[in-house]
Amino acid sequence: MSGQPKRLMVMAGGTGGHVFPGLAVAHHLMAQGWQVRWLGTADRMEADLVPKHGIDIDFIRISGLRGKGVKALLAAPLRIFNAWRQARAIMKRFKPDVVLGMGGYVSGPGGLAAWSLGIPVVLHEQNGIAGLTNQWLAKIATTVMQAFPGAFPNAEVVGNPVRTDVLALPLPQVRLAGRDGPIRVLVVGGSQGARVLNQTMPQVAARLGDTVTIWHQSGKGVQHTVEQAYAGVGQPQHKVTEFIDDMAAAYAWADVVVCRSGALTVSEIAAAGLPAIFVPFQHKDRQQYWNALPLENAGAAKIFEQPQFTVEAVADTLAGWSRGALLTMAERARAVSIPDATERVASEVSRVART
């Protein structure tokens, strides 16, 4: 049996912030000869995305409990029990040597099933404040890791696994050397866009005139509206796209980013070495604020809570940053990044796997 490849089951679903780091670790271990399967749900993004990466996926039926009403809460124990039974049956068939929980509702029943079968459970928390599933699973996990300090008091800080093309970008002092002309501002609202960015940044452009050039990802279905907003204030020259397929190229182009502060976005911006203005999405638990705080504390970014994200405040901030200041911020961002996060997570998975 010693010649058999090790087996990993990745448990992650729902959003790219959970799925993409899991894929990075999966590919790293597959390159070392590991067999990897995925545990997810059939109605979320992992169902389509994971098979495209050459990884087989098994599904269980589970969804979130927040905001579902009294009936859903009363039915929750039965739903969780059924999902646990499904996950347990899947793991009995695949016989993983270790499971890796990257977040999302699927990790709860999956982690409990693995624990009940004596399979080591490794958790990775991507956000600066722990999600409910990981808070609960941490009590039974073999190892807990975190991307940012503070999610768990005693967990090792390992960063977030990010895409290799972002990690391959030249260092800020190389990439930004010799640049002049207008400051290049990359505006990213995530794949869904962000209304506050779409409404505010054209007005900022009007204030700053030819001192900036903007590349603005608007999100789905509103590209024309945002283009009209720029044109309406006499700034039609700025580039508006619905999506940006090659984020590494966009980061390489930019001098500064204006964006939400999802966990992966923050980690990618740090890895690329870019200054940022972060506008945290207003979650109840302020998850995105806590993600961005380490970069602000390092002098690499400025956080504007949404009510403070005004035309005047943003325009004044951007106007106040010289190229020299932006380079210093970029170097600080890169200095606090953890570029070997994928290797750190994979190493821990290997360490605790059953022999």
UniProtKB/Swiss-Prot annotation:
Catalytic activity as recorded in UniProt: di-trans,octa-cis-undecaprenyl diphospho-N-acetyl-alpha-D-muramoyl-L-alanyl-D-glutamyl-meso-2,6-diaminopimeloyl-D-alanyl-D-alanine + UDP-N-acetyl-alpha-D-glucosamine = di-trans,octa-cis-undecaprenyl diphospho-[N-acetyl-alpha-D-glucosaminyl-(1->4)]-N-acetyl-alpha-D-muramoyl-L-alanyl-D-glutamyl-meso-2,6-diaminopimeloyl-D-alanyl-D-alanine + UDP + H(+)
Classification via Gene3D superfamilies: Glycogen Phosphorylase B (3.40.50.2000)
An example Gene Ontology molecular-function term: undecaprenyldiphospho-muramoylpentapeptide beta-N-acetylglucosaminyltransferase activity
Keywords linked to the UniProt accession: Cell cycle, Cell division, Cell inner membrane, Cell membrane, Cell shape, Cell wall biogenesis/degradation, Glycosyltransferase, Membrane, Peptidoglycan synthesis, Transferase
Annotated compartments: Cell inner membrane
A Pfam match: Glyco_tran_28_C
EC code(s) of this entry: 2.4.1.227
Bilayer topology: Peripheral membrane protein
Domain of life from the UniProt record: Bacteria
Disulfide bridge partners, by residue number: none
Pathway assigned to this chain's UniProt record: Cell wall biogenesis; peptidoglycan biosynthesis
GO cellular component: plasma membrane
Residues binding UDP-N-acetyl-alpha-D-glucosamine, per UniProt: 15-17, 127, 163, 191, 244, 263-268, 288
Keyword Glycosyltransferase tagged: yes
SUPFAM superfamilies, sorted: UDP-Glycosyltransferase/glycogen phosphorylase
Chief location of this protein within or outside the cell: membrane
Class of enzymatic activity (EC top level): transferase
Coiled-coil boundaries: none
Gene Ontology biological-process annotations: carbohydrate metabolic process; cell division; cell wall organization; lipid glycosylation; peptidoglycan biosynthetic process; regulation of cell shape
UniProt keyword annotation of DNA damage present: no
InterPro entries, per database record: GlcNAc_MurG (IPR006009), Glyco_trans_28_C (IPR007235), GlycoTrans_28_N (IPR004276)
Similarity comment text for this entry: Belongs to the glycosyltransferase 28 family. MurG subfamily.
Job of this protein: Cell wall formation. Catalyzes the transfer of a GlcNAc subunit on undecaprenyl-pyrophosphoryl-MurNAc-pentapeptide (lipid intermediate I) to form undecaprenyl-pyrophosphoryl-MurNAc-(pentapeptide)GlcNAc (lipid intermediate II).
Protein's recorded name: UDP-N-acetylglucosamine--N-acetylmuramyl-(pentapeptide) pyrophosphoryl-undecaprenol N-acetylglucosamine transferase
Organism: Salmonella dublin (strain CT_02021853)
